[in-house]
Protein backbone atom coordinates (compact mmCIF):
# COMPACT_ATOMS: atom_id res chain seq x y z
CA UNK A 1 0.00 0.00 0.00
CA UNK A 2 1.50 3.34 -1.09
CA UNK A 3 0.55 5.18 2.10
CA UNK A 4 2.97 7.32 4.10
CA UNK A 5 0.48 9.74 5.67
CA UNK A 6 0.23 7.71 8.88
CA UNK A 7 3.93 8.23 9.68
CA UNK A 8 4.34 9.64 13.18
CA UNK A 9 1.01 8.29 14.43
CA UNK A 10 -0.28 4.90 15.49
CA UNK A 11 -1.59 2.53 12.83
CA UNK A 12 -3.25 -0.88 12.56
CA UNK A 13 -0.45 -3.38 12.06
CA UNK A 14 -2.75 -6.39 11.76
CA UNK A 15 -6.50 -6.96 11.82
CA UNK A 16 -7.48 -10.56 12.60
CA UNK A 17 -10.95 -9.96 11.17
CA UNK A 18 -9.49 -10.43 7.70
CA UNK A 19 -7.69 -13.62 8.69
CA UNK A 20 -10.52 -15.13 10.75
CA UNK A 21 -12.99 -14.62 7.91
CA UNK A 22 -11.22 -17.41 6.03
CA UNK A 23 -11.84 -19.93 8.81
CA UNK A 24 -14.69 -21.09 10.99
CA UNK A 25 -13.66 -19.44 14.21
CA UNK A 26 -15.75 -18.25 17.14
CA UNK A 27 -13.03 -16.02 18.55
CA UNK A 28 -13.89 -12.31 18.32
CA UNK A 29 -11.63 -10.39 15.94
CA UNK A 30 -9.07 -7.99 17.32
CA UNK A 31 -6.46 -5.56 16.05
CA UNK A 32 -2.76 -5.20 16.73
CA UNK A 33 -2.03 -1.47 16.82
CA UNK A 34 1.54 -0.27 16.44
CA UNK A 35 2.11 2.94 18.36
CA UNK A 36 5.90 2.96 18.48
CA UNK A 37 5.97 6.65 17.60
CA UNK A 38 3.03 8.05 19.58
CA UNK A 39 2.17 8.05 23.30
CA UNK A 40 -0.62 10.12 24.83
CA UNK A 41 -3.02 9.96 27.75
CA UNK A 42 -6.08 7.66 27.43
CA UNK A 43 -4.74 6.45 24.09
CA UNK A 44 -5.82 2.83 24.43
CA UNK A 45 -9.33 3.76 25.59
CA UNK A 46 -9.74 6.17 22.67
CA UNK A 47 -8.17 4.12 19.87
CA UNK A 48 -8.75 0.47 20.77
CA UNK A 49 -11.23 -2.09 22.04
CA UNK A 50 -10.66 -4.17 25.16
CA UNK A 51 -9.46 -7.25 23.27
CA UNK A 52 -7.11 -5.32 20.97
CA UNK A 53 -3.34 -5.21 21.47
CA UNK A 54 -1.41 -1.93 21.38
CA UNK A 55 2.37 -1.92 21.12
CA UNK A 56 4.67 0.87 22.34
CA UNK A 57 8.42 1.14 21.78
CA UNK A 58 10.90 2.09 24.50
CA UNK A 59 13.76 2.69 22.08
CA UNK A 60 15.80 5.69 23.36
CA UNK A 61 14.53 8.12 20.69
CA UNK A 62 10.84 7.26 21.14
CA UNK A 63 8.34 9.41 23.08
CA UNK A 64 8.89 7.31 26.22
CA UNK A 65 12.52 6.35 25.83
CA UNK A 66 14.08 3.50 27.74
CA UNK A 67 17.20 1.52 27.01
CA UNK A 68 15.37 -0.73 24.55
CA UNK A 69 12.37 -3.03 24.28
CA UNK A 70 8.73 -2.09 24.46
CA UNK A 71 5.34 -2.50 26.12
CA UNK A 72 2.23 -4.36 25.06
CA UNK A 73 -1.13 -3.09 26.36
CA UNK A 74 -4.55 -4.74 26.37
CA UNK A 75 -7.59 -5.24 28.60
CA UNK A 76 -7.66 -8.89 27.49
CA UNK A 77 -6.02 -10.71 30.42
CA UNK A 78 -5.61 -13.96 28.48
CA UNK A 79 -3.53 -12.27 25.78
CA UNK A 80 -1.40 -10.35 28.27
CA UNK A 81 -0.73 -13.46 30.38
CA UNK A 82 0.22 -15.39 27.25
CA UNK A 83 2.65 -12.79 25.90
CA UNK A 84 4.11 -12.20 29.36
CA UNK A 85 4.85 -15.92 29.60
CA UNK A 86 6.36 -16.45 26.13
CA UNK A 87 8.63 -13.43 26.55
CA UNK A 88 9.80 -14.90 29.86
CA UNK A 89 11.07 -18.26 28.60
CA UNK A 90 7.54 -19.66 28.30
CA UNK A 91 7.22 -19.66 32.07
CA UNK A 92 4.11 -18.62 33.97
CA UNK A 93 4.44 -17.88 37.66
CA UNK A 94 1.77 -19.75 39.63
CA UNK A 95 2.16 -17.80 42.87
CA UNK A 96 4.35 -15.26 44.59
CA UNK A 97 7.25 -17.67 44.99
CA UNK A 98 9.59 -17.06 42.07
CA UNK A 99 11.04 -20.57 42.31
CA UNK A 100 7.64 -22.21 41.82
CA UNK A 101 6.86 -21.73 38.16
CA UNK A 102 5.00 -23.55 35.42
CA UNK A 103 6.33 -23.99 31.89
CA UNK A 104 3.34 -23.49 29.59
CA UNK A 105 5.00 -23.00 26.20
CA UNK A 106 8.27 -22.61 24.37
CA UNK A 107 9.41 -19.03 24.73
CA UNK A 108 12.15 -16.42 24.53
CA UNK A 109 14.21 -14.42 27.00
CA UNK A 110 12.78 -11.03 26.09
CA UNK A 111 11.71 -9.56 29.43
CA UNK A 112 13.32 -6.25 30.45
CA UNK A 113 15.74 -5.80 33.29
CA UNK A 114 15.24 -3.44 36.23
CA UNK A 115 17.43 -0.69 34.77
CA UNK A 116 15.39 -0.60 31.54
CA UNK A 117 12.15 -0.36 33.50
CA UNK A 118 13.52 2.40 35.74
CA UNK A 119 14.58 4.60 32.80
CA UNK A 120 11.26 4.09 31.01
CA UNK A 121 9.21 4.86 34.14
CA UNK A 122 11.14 8.07 34.79
CA UNK A 123 10.56 9.21 31.22
CA UNK A 124 6.88 8.29 31.45
CA UNK A 125 6.58 10.55 34.51
CA UNK A 126 7.87 13.45 32.38
CA UNK A 127 5.66 12.70 29.36
CA UNK A 128 3.14 15.55 29.80
CA UNK A 129 5.89 18.11 30.32
CA UNK A 130 7.83 16.71 27.39
CA UNK A 131 4.80 16.72 25.06
CA UNK A 132 4.03 20.33 25.95
CA UNK A 133 7.55 21.43 25.00
CA UNK A 134 7.58 19.25 21.88
CA UNK A 135 4.31 20.86 20.74
CA UNK A 136 5.82 24.32 21.21
CA UNK A 137 8.83 23.38 19.08
CA UNK A 138 6.63 21.73 16.47
CA UNK A 139 4.49 24.84 16.15
CA UNK A 140 7.58 27.02 15.63
CA UNK A 141 8.87 24.65 12.97
CA UNK A 142 5.49 24.41 11.24
CA UNK A 143 5.20 28.18 11.06
CA UNK A 144 8.77 28.63 9.80
CA UNK A 145 8.61 25.88 7.18
CA UNK A 146 4.90 26.26 6.28
CA UNK A 147 4.15 22.65 7.19
CA UNK A 148 1.43 20.91 9.20
CA UNK A 149 3.44 18.14 10.84
CA UNK A 150 1.61 16.49 13.75
CA UNK A 151 4.08 13.91 15.04
CA UNK A 152 5.72 14.25 18.44
CA UNK A 153 8.32 11.65 17.53
CA UNK A 154 10.28 13.04 14.56
CA UNK A 155 10.11 16.30 12.65
CA UNK A 156 10.40 15.47 8.96
CA UNK A 157 11.11 17.86 6.11
CA UNK A 158 11.97 17.31 2.46
CA UNK A 159 15.24 18.23 0.76
CA UNK A 160 15.74 17.91 -2.98
CA UNK A 161 19.28 16.66 -2.38
CA UNK A 162 19.08 14.87 0.93
CA UNK A 163 22.74 13.90 1.30
CA UNK A 164 23.97 17.38 0.40
CA UNK A 165 21.50 18.92 2.85
CA UNK A 166 22.69 16.64 5.64
CA UNK A 167 26.34 17.50 4.95
CA UNK A 168 25.48 21.19 4.96
CA UNK A 169 23.67 20.94 8.30
CA UNK A 170 26.53 18.95 9.82
CA UNK A 171 28.93 21.78 8.95
CA UNK A 172 26.86 23.96 11.30
CA UNK A 173 26.76 21.31 14.03
CA UNK A 174 23.15 20.32 13.30
CA UNK A 175 22.55 16.57 13.44
CA UNK A 176 19.93 15.25 11.00
CA UNK A 177 18.27 11.88 10.60
CA UNK A 178 18.46 9.66 7.54
CA UNK A 179 15.27 7.62 7.10
CA UNK A 180 15.08 4.00 6.05
CA UNK A 181 14.71 3.22 2.37
CA UNK A 182 11.54 1.64 0.96
CA UNK A 183 11.15 -1.83 2.47
CA UNK A 184 9.88 -3.39 -0.75
CA UNK A 185 13.23 -2.73 -2.47
CA UNK A 186 15.05 -5.10 -0.11
CA UNK A 187 16.00 -8.54 -1.51
CA UNK A 188 13.74 -10.29 1.01
CA UNK A 189 10.62 -8.90 -0.67
CA UNK A 190 11.66 -9.84 -4.20
CA UNK A 191 9.64 -13.05 -3.86
CA UNK A 192 6.57 -11.12 -4.93
CA UNK A 193 6.15 -8.11 -7.17
CA UNK A 194 4.67 -5.07 -5.46
CA UNK A 195 2.18 -2.65 -6.90
CA UNK A 196 3.21 0.90 -7.81
CA UNK A 197 4.75 2.62 -4.78
CA UNK A 198 5.89 5.86 -6.39
CA UNK A 199 4.86 8.00 -3.42
CA UNK A 200 6.92 5.86 -1.05
CA UNK A 201 9.99 5.94 -3.29
CA UNK A 202 9.84 9.70 -3.83
CA UNK A 203 9.37 10.41 -0.13
CA UNK A 204 12.31 8.18 0.75
CA UNK A 205 14.61 10.09 -1.57
CA UNK A 206 13.79 13.45 0.03
CA UNK A 207 12.77 12.91 3.65
CA UNK A 208 15.14 13.94 6.42
CA UNK A 209 14.61 14.69 10.11
CA UNK A 210 15.90 17.74 11.95
CA UNK A 211 16.57 18.06 15.73
CA UNK A 212 13.33 17.60 17.68
CA UNK A 213 13.56 17.08 21.42
CA UNK A 214 12.42 18.85 24.55
CA UNK A 215 15.93 19.96 25.55
CA UNK A 216 16.20 22.39 22.61
CA UNK A 217 16.23 26.04 23.66
CA UNK A 218 14.46 28.76 21.71
CA UNK A 219 17.89 29.95 20.63
CA UNK A 220 18.66 26.47 19.29
CA UNK A 221 15.38 26.38 17.39
CA UNK A 222 15.96 29.78 15.79
CA UNK A 223 19.46 28.70 14.73
CA UNK A 224 18.12 25.50 13.13
CA UNK A 225 15.30 27.33 11.36
CA UNK A 226 17.68 29.95 9.98
CA UNK A 227 20.13 27.37 8.64
CA UNK A 228 17.41 25.22 7.07
CA UNK A 229 15.72 28.20 5.41
CA UNK A 230 19.04 29.60 4.21
CA UNK A 231 19.83 26.28 2.56
CA UNK A 232 16.52 26.30 0.75
Describe each PLM feature range.
Residues 40-41, 62-66, 80, 165-166, ...:
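Short catalytic/ligand-binding loop motif for oxyanion handling, primarily in non-cytosolic enzymes
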Residues 83, 165-173, 224-229:
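Short amphipathic alpha-helices in soluble, non-transmembrane regions
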Residues 191-232:
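PLP-dependent enzyme catalytic core of the Aspartate aminotransferase-like
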Amino acid sequence: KDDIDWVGSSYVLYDTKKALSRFKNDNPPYKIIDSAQEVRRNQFAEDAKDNDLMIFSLYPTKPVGGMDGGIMVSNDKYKIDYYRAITHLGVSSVNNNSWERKLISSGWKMHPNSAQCYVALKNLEKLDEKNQRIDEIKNQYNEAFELTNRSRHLYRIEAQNKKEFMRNMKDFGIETGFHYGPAHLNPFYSIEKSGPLDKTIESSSKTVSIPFNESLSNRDIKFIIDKVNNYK
